């Protein structure tokens, strides 16, 4: 799908990847990009910058998401692209609190479910639409020291696969973005999934995302090395797990020495 003349909603749009994508799509001729963020001031600032609507919204609140889509469709037009990008890091393993696990589940899984529920009926009726989920390389591989994050990002990828299987023949495109480290506010908190192959800039990720949806490519990998790691994991899971245990041990040694 080309973004030209399209109406898009971008969550997590107040900064980082989201704001970079919003700017890129407007520069590419989008009709409108609605910028959504839980930080209303940030959303409105980006919206003002690109000449579009900026909205404060909690993506884990289904009623708010549904109301936004209804508003956009009434005031601007049908939503062509929903970039479900909001996310946050969380450390810990199975010992992390139930509240921490649930918060990550709501943000990294249910927020995408709510977005899909809100836009899919209209998209399917038109036979045209695109969903993009921001997951993480941690969802394809793992993140040392961040179980709630990597587990819920893995679920995000499976949800995207499920929607693509169910609605690919209905004219619905689906992509899932799986970066390693990106130079955003989250970068200092990225544990184990961001430093191996370098930190990339949000503007670069925006270009990669735009090209992927233009080509209808499901898996978006701003760090191409991730594909190699996924193939190695699939070829020999036991060897991969041993390697991850070594990585964890090195990480713990570094933490103890700091």
Regions found by a protein language model. Give the residues of each.
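Canonical Rossmann dinucleotide-binding motif of NAD(H)/NADP(H)-dependent dehydrogenases/reductases
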Residues: 2-33
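Conserved glycine-rich Rossmann-like NAD(P)H-binding loop of the short-chain dehydrogenase/reductase
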Residues: 30-45
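The beta1-alpha1 cofactor-binding region of Rossmann-like NAD(H)/NADP(H)-dependent oxidoreductases
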Residues: 40, 57-67, 98
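Conserved mid-core segment of classical short-chain dehydrogenase/reductases
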Residues: 66, 88-102, 145-148
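Active-site helix of classical SDR
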Residues: 116, 152
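Residue(s) in the substrate-gating loop at a strand-loop-helix junction
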Residues: 136
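C-terminal helical subdomain
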Residues: 176, 192-229
């Amino acid at each position: 799908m080309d973004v030209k003349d399209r109406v898009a909603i971008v969550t997590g749009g107040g900064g980082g990847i989201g704001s970079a994508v919003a700017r890129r799509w407007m520069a590419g001729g989008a009709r409108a990009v609605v910028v959504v963020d839980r930080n209303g001031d940030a959303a409105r600032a980006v919206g003002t910058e690109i000449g579009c609507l900026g909205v404060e919204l909690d993506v884990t609140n289904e009623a708010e998401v549904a109301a936004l889509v209804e508003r956009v469709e009434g005031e601007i037009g049908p939503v062509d692209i929903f970039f479900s990008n909001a996310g946050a890091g969380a450390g810990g393993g199975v010992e992390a609190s139930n509240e921490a696990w649930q918060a990550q589940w709501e943000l990294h899984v249910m927020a995408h479910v709510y977005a899909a529920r809100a836009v899919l009926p209209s998209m399917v009726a038109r036979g045209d639409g695109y969903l993009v989920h921001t997951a993480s390389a941690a969802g394809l591989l793992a993140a040392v020291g961040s179980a709630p994050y990597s587990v819920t990002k893995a679920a995000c990828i499976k949800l995207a696969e499920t929607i693509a299987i169910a609605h690919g023949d209905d004219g619905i495109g689906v992509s899932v973005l799986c970066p390693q480290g990106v130079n955003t506010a989250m970068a200092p908190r990225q544990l184990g999934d961001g430093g191996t192959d370098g930190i990339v800039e949000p503007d670069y990720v925006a270009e990669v995302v735009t090209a992927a949806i233009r080509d209808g490519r499901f898996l978006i990998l701003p760090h191409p090395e991730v594909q190699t790691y996924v193939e190695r994991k699939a070829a020999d899971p036991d060897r991969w797990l041993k390697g991850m245990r070594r990585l964890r041990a090195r990480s713990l040694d570094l933490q103890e020495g700091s």
